[in-house]
Curated annotation (Swiss-Prot):
Pathway: Amino-acid biosynthesis; L-isoleucine biosynthesis; L-isoleucine from 2-oxobutanoate: step 3/4; Amino-acid biosynthesis; L-valine biosynthesis; L-valine from pyruvate: step 3/4. It comes from Corynebacterium kroppenstedtii (strain DSM 44385 / JCM 11950 / CIP 105744 / CCUG 35717). The gene is ilvD. Keywords: 2Fe-2S, Amino-acid biosynthesis, Branched-chain amino acid biosynthesis, Iron, Iron-sulfur, Lyase, Magnesium, Metal-binding. This is Dihydroxy-acid dehydratase. Mg(2+) binds at D81, D123, K124, E493. HAMAP family: IlvD.
Length: 616
């Protein structure tokens, strides 16, 4: 039997002061022998993916209490990447991941909590809490707020937009053929409900990956925020975490700990899922960071290996008209895992917080088996309500039929894959000695080789101005540098540049490369995470306008076609300059908080984690 961590605050004479404070917070005598379970909520009125979470903590707490635990809720910050996009606010997005990780660790360890339920949803919140869970390694379960419904189809000036989402609105804003009235129509349709944005963007990608890691319940990644079926996920999470506490503390069963659930094979499976579903490139950053926090031997080489082995089985917005509600109708994440498992592409020796084995897991939740269970059929029939709302669990609509078409449906089998390679591809070459990432699922295969003259810009703001002022020409490779974790600092997302290129009709005529990153909503020939970044001496910092840059997805190469002696001369000149490896004439205020982050930030190939001297 393992003593409860909380016993240092609840047991013995020395804990009298702590017990007095616990009593003031509502605990009673009978609570001091029960596990104290932290609920890390991320409710905020700033973010549509979190605006509905205010009362969700009470649902989880009630289930914990009924199962025999003591729930204690606290909140973390949550940044909305879409609202922070396109201005200085985006500098704070990735650093907020570390703030969230640290705040969860601080609260849990300061109060000696025995376990944690992570109520997350949007872009940096799930990764931040995941890093904390791997770091703490106490019983943990994830349950997210769920995706929003897709926007309804609209027709603007005779052009159909079906269905709409956030990216539709951003692209339309840069399209001169869409007038203000038309833009208003798209804007008012794009984001109709609470929940994380409706495509396979970063939030939904990460919430889906927690399923594959085994740390959340089936349906976590795809059950709509507005559907009544999602309430059961919160209730079951509360009951499950108490059971996990009993198994660990009462029966010495350490299989429930995050590092044993999300082990090396689970990370392999999660990234295999990511490749198959065409997830956001941001998942590469976050999975690498989580592995480091948990001391899991998983790195960029593993991701490269998997990208060569795993086919792309699903294309979801922004790469098609499918959205998360369509993924759910097709069986959600268990259906994709089932297709991968039947093809022998998953490790079958993993378990989850809800299942002792992968076979048990899929036998219960994969609707594409010969005998799907009624519980799975009921869950995946959950359909959108079609009503603008910020109220969770407000619809009980059902699909008339499920999408089990493995040839042409939302989720395909391996024999009918979109591409033989995975949705994400790792590129290397003299421009990316430590790696770069491209979302191949978002590009027609005819564009997998692109070569053109560089158009160099020292910031995202300069790039946006150049695009909107029609300074970018077809055939060019737009280079946005000094936007890496240290150089930005904060590694901004380049959603606006990619969306504006698309809106200007250049989405397939230009490429964009950067040491920054991309939104899960980005599309087009977009290469990010170039490592080493410009601020760390990366070759991207030596590109001149007109230099030829070549992207070759088939060969997995990213190269700058400039003679070595010329590059050596440029590097020497840079090193002796007044401000080496800094952007020229960039107007940007960098706060002390961001400077502190930049001083510790590593490049993207290591997940942009902080480099901290070990003082143990």
């Amino acid at each position: 039997m393992i003593p409860l961590r909380s016993s240092v605050t609840t047991q013995g004479r020395n804990a009298a002061g702590a017990r007095a404070l616990w009593r003031a917070a509502g605990l009673k005598d009978g609570d001091f022998n029960k596990p104290i379970i932290a609920i890390a909520n991320s409710y905020t009125q700033f973010v549509p993916g979190h605006v509905h979470l205010k009362d969700v903590g009470d649902i989880v707490a009630g289930a914990i209490r009924e199962a025999g635990g003591v729930p204690r809720e606290f909140n973390t910050i949550a940044v909305d990447d879409g609202i922070a996009m396109g201005h200085g606010g985006m500098l704070y997005s990735l650093p907020s991941r570390e703030i969230i990780s640290d705040s969860v660790e601080y609260m849990v360890n300061a109060h000696a909590a025995d376990a944690i339920v992570c109520i997350s949803n949007c872009d940096k919140i799930t990764p931040g809490m995941l890093n904390a869970a791997m770091r703490l390694n106490i019983p943990a379960i994830f349950v997210s707020g769920g995706p929003m419904e897709a926007g309804k189809a609209v027709v603007v000036d005779g052009v159909a937009h079906t269905p709409t989402d956030l990216i539709t609105a951003i692209s339309a804003s840069a399209n001169d053929s869409v007038d203000d009235r038309g833009l208003s129509i798209v804007e008012n349709s794009a984001c109709p409900t609470c929940g994380s944005c409706s495509g396979m963007f970063t939030a939904n990608s990460m919430n889906s990956l927690t399923e594959a890691l085994g740390l959340s319940l089936p349906g976590n990644g795809s059950t709509l925020a507005t559907h009544a079926a999602r309430r059961a996920l919160f209730e079951n999470a509360g009951r499950t975490i108490v059971d996990m506490c009993q198994r660990y503390y009462n029966h010495d069963d350490d299989s429930v700990l995050p590092r044993n659930v999300a082990n090396k094979h689970a990370f392999d499976n999660a990234m295999t899922l990511d490749m198959a579903m065409g997830g956001s490139t941001n998942t590469v950053l976050h999975i690498l960071a989580a592995a480091q926090e948990g001391d899991i031997d998983f790195d960029l080489a593993d991701i490269d290996r998997l990208s060569r082995e795993v086919p792309c089985l699903s294309k979801v917005a922004p790469n098609s008209n499918y959205h998360m509600e369509d993924v759910h109708r097709a069986g959600g994440i268990p259906a994709i895992l089932g297709e991968l498992n039947r093809a022998g592409l998953l490790h079958d020796d993993v378990h989850a917080v809800h299942a002792q084995s992968l076979s048990d897991w899929l036998a219960t939740w994969d609707i594409r088996t010969d005998n799907p269970t009624q519980i799975a059929l009921d869950l995946f029939h959950a359909a959108p309500g079609g009503v603008r709302t910020t109220v969770p669990f407000s619809t009980d609509n059902k699909w008339d039929e499920l999408d089990t078409d493995s040839e042409n449906g939302c989720i395909r089998d391996v024999d009918h894959a979109y591409t033989a390679d995975g949705g994400l591809v790792i590129l290397r070459g003299n421009l990316a000695e430590d790696g770069a990432v491209i979302k191949a699922a978002g590009i027609d295969e005819s564009l997998w080789h692109f070569s053109g003259p560089a158009h160099v810009l020292e910031s995202q703001e300069d790039a946006v101005n150049a695009i909107l002022n029609k300074q970018i020409k077809p055939g060019e490779v737009v280079v946005i540098r000094y936007e890496g974790p240290a150089g930005g600092p904060g590694m901004q997302e380049m959603l606006h540049p990619t969306a504006f290129l698309k809106g200007a009709g250049l989405g397939t005529q230009c490429a964009l490369i950067t040491d920054g990153r991309f939104s899960g909503g980005s599309s087009g020939i977009s290469v990010g995470h170039i490592s080493p970044e410009a601020a760390h001496g990366g070759l991207i910092g030596l590109i001149h306008d007109g230099d030829t840059v070549t992207i070759d997805v088939h060969k997995r190469q990213l190269t700058l076609d400039v003679p070595e002696d010329v590059l050596a001369e440029r590097r020497e000149k840079m090193n002796v300059s007044e401000h080496p490896w800094r952007p020229l004439n960039r107007q940007r205020r960098v706060s002390k908080a961001l400077q502190a982050y930049a001083s510790m930030a590593t490049s993207a190939d290591t997940g942009a984690v902080r480099k901290v001297n070990d003082r143990r």
